[in-house]
């Protein structure tokens, strides 16, 4: 079977993700032209290219931020239609964006932001987390990731580096199938990146 690649456009058995012929255009520019990408489960994969090559655009298609793409997305051997962030989340896809200020809710605490996805998923269900339980789970996730921030601290009180780490913790807390990281450690120091 060889590497985690494509064989004549067919889905390789065991692939977690397959993006086929993904194209997207914005007024005056074709951002992606029949892009292809595949990933195996349990492995880290990287998109490498020059600025403006379409790496972030491809990741945003997967996250549901760009609904007007053409092409196919396959997840665990099944075709999926991802046209919104809710579609991505329903399919077990999480993304950590470069833009931390738009991804976190500043009026909420660190713990509330870390557990936000799970809390929203459980809205209307009897499994609503009690606030004490939420903070305990958030504290455990932060500790496991060596993030030294109190879960009760407000996000608006954090440094940019701390915000980035909280955003990564939130993505990890969901136990998703596919975690997309768009330069997640760009705002962090070498030491902070190594600790994460």
Predicted ranges, named:
Residues 9, 13-196:
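Glycine-rich phosphate-binding loops of nucleotide-dependent enzymes
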């Amino acid at each position: 079977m060889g590497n985690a690649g494509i064989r004549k456009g067919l889905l390789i058995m065991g692939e977690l993700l397959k993006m086929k012929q993904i194209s997207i255009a914005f007024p005056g520019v074709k951002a992606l032209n029949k892009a292809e990408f595949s990933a195996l489960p349990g492995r880290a994969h990287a998109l490498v290219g020059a600025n403006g090559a379409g790496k972030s655009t491809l990741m945003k298609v997967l996250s549901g931020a760009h609904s007007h793409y053409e092409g196919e997305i396959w997840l665990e051997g099944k075709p999926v239609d991802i046209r919104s962030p809710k579609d991505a989340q329903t399919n077990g896809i999480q993304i950590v964006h470069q833009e931390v200020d738009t991804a976190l809710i500043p009026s909420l605490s660190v713990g509330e932001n870390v557990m936000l996805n799970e809390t929203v998923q459980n809205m209307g269900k009897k499994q609503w987390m009690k606030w004490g339980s939420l903070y305990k789970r958030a504290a455990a996730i932060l500790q496991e990731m060596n993030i030294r921030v109190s879960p009760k601290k407000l996000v608006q009180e954090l440094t940019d580096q701390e915000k980035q780490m909280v955003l990564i913790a939130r993505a990890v807390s969901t136990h998703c199938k596919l975690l997309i990281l768009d330069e997640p450690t760009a705002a962090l120091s070498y030491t902070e990146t190594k600790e994460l």
